[in-house]
């Protein structure tokens, strides 16, 4: 008994040491941006985005405080097998006051188990809410392949010539399905689930420094028992993606081709909206973008994209965008950036065009001499010029020609220009 009692303090000390080591192993990652800006004509900073475009050129053109705070920890490891718990909470406010309250968005909460299946070495089994293998263009904050949400999957299965990933995720639409509470009275669901099933094959070597990734996504509305979709609802749809990545000049170039149908044409990124009656049709996208650090003096980001959404409802659009962001590095921690971007969006219904030019000059101090170096503090001046001839009706949501020149009856902004200036910080870790 005395021996047991003498061993107890030692056991407690060892356990405390283990718990302390585990506590110190918590990983803290995230992203944040915030700042202050003014508009030349008066008031707080305005931001500029062409009506009908899905994104905007972001340098000197972000008007909110936004943050993602990630906490994660490896909870168990034995040999090459492990379990990792990952979370992410996101916030966004208008950066107008000292005290701004908001409801946080719980973006991620998942477990990733590595090498759990002996006959699939290197694979990861996962379940929960997750940012799943997202593909984006940083300089316009545009996610062109993103099925994130609650889900489960098996990824990075080594086939010898490439890696296979399988996943299922879910998002919901407000309303969208109904049942009958009596013979002639419809009762609508608060939300209708949409499921997406994703297959990807990555790491296909095509040429020196070049790899190919192929993927297919099938999305469908999944109404609850005894509920039905509206007549004409798209119900389901497909999206196919091919992406070639080339390592070049200290960075990369990505060339992407995507084609989507019906329920997958609403977001054009991999999310499904099968309850909609307005998205039957197709989408084709051709995209080229990249980021490079040529040497200690020069870096560059760029994007060029064509996207055509052809809908049976005639509410589609054709969107062209092209932009560059060269960076001159005065010292390893100070640089000047110039971002020039152009958007042109043609309405399928009216055949009218909206276009916008946006130019930003920024002086930046950053933690390193790469285009990706962060944290960064920048001061900027932005000029935007737009000419918009159509918008979405304030009543019907349909595309409508704007003859007022002021956007009085639609989301169109008319013909105008503006200057803004300010300061911003951006960080990821």
Swiss-Prot record:
Pfam families in the record: LamB
The gene coding this protein: lamB2
Catalytic activity annotation: beta-maltose(in) = beta-maltose(out)
Annotated site residue numbers, Greasy slide, important in sugar transport: 31, 66, 99, 252, 372, 428
Highest taxon, organism lineage: Bacteria
InterPro entries named among the record's database cross-references: G_neg_Bact_CarbUptk_Porin (IPR050286), Maltoporin (IPR023738), Porin_LamB (IPR003192), Porin_LamB_sf (IPR036998)
Function per UniProt: Involved in the transport of maltose and maltodextrins.
Protein name per Swiss-Prot or TrEMBL: Maltoporin 2
Biased composition (Polar residues): 397-412
Site (Important in sugar transport): residue numbering on this chain: 143
């Amino acid at each position: 008994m005395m021996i047991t009692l003498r061993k107890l303090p030692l056991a407690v000390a060892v356990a405390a040491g283990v718990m302390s080591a585990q506590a110190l192993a918590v990983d803290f990652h995230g992203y944040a941006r915030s700042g202050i800006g003014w508009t030349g004509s008066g008031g707080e900073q305005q931001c500029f985005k062409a009506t009908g475009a899905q994104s905007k050129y972001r340098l000197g053109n972000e008007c909110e405080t936004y943050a993602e705070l990630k906490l994660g920890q490896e909870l168990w490891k034995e040999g090459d097998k492990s379990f990792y718990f990952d979370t992410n909470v996101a916030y966004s406010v208008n950066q107008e006051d000292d005290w701004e309250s908001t409801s946080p968005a719980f973006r991620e909460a998942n477990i990733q188990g590595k090498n759990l299946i002996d006959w699939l070495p290197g694979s990861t089994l996962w379940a929960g809410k997750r940012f799943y293998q997202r593909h984006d263009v940083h300089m316009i904050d545009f996610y062109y392949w993103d099925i994130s949400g609650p889900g489960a999957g098996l990824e990075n299965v080594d086939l010898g010539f490439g890696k296979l990933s399988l996943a299922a995720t879910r998002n919901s639409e407000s309303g969208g399905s109904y049942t009958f509470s009596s013979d002639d009275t419809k009762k609508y669901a608060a939300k209708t689930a949409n499921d997406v099933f994703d297959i990807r094959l990555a790491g296909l070597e095509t040429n020196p420094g070049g790899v190919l990734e192929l993927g297919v996504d099938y999305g469908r509305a999944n109404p609850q028992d005894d509920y039905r979709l509206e007549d004409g609802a798209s119900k389901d749809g497909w999206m196919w993606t091919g992406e070639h990545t080339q390592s070049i000049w200290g960075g990369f170039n990505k060339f992407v081709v995507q084609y989507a149908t019906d329920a997958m044409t609403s977001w054009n990124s991999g999310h499904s909206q099968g309850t909609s009656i307005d998205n039957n049709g197709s989408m084709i996208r051709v995209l080229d973008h990249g980021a490079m650090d040529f040497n200690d003096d020069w870096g560059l980001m760029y994007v060029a994209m064509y996207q055509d959404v052809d809908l049976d409802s005639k509410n589609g659009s054709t969107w062209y965008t092209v932009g560059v962001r060269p960076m001159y590095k005065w010292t390893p921690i100070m640089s000047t950036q110039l971002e020039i971007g152009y958007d042109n969006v043609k309405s399928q219904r009216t055949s009218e065009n909206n276009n916008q030019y946006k130019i930003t000059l920024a002086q930046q101090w950053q933690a390193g001499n790469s285009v990706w170096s962060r944290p960064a503090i920048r001061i900027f001046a932005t000029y935007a010029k737009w000419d918009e001839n159509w918008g979405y009706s304030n009543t019907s949501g349909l595309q409508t020609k704007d003859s007022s020149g002021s956007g009085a009856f639609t989301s169109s902004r008319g013909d105008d220009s503006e200057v803004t200036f300010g300061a911003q910080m951006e960080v990821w870790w």
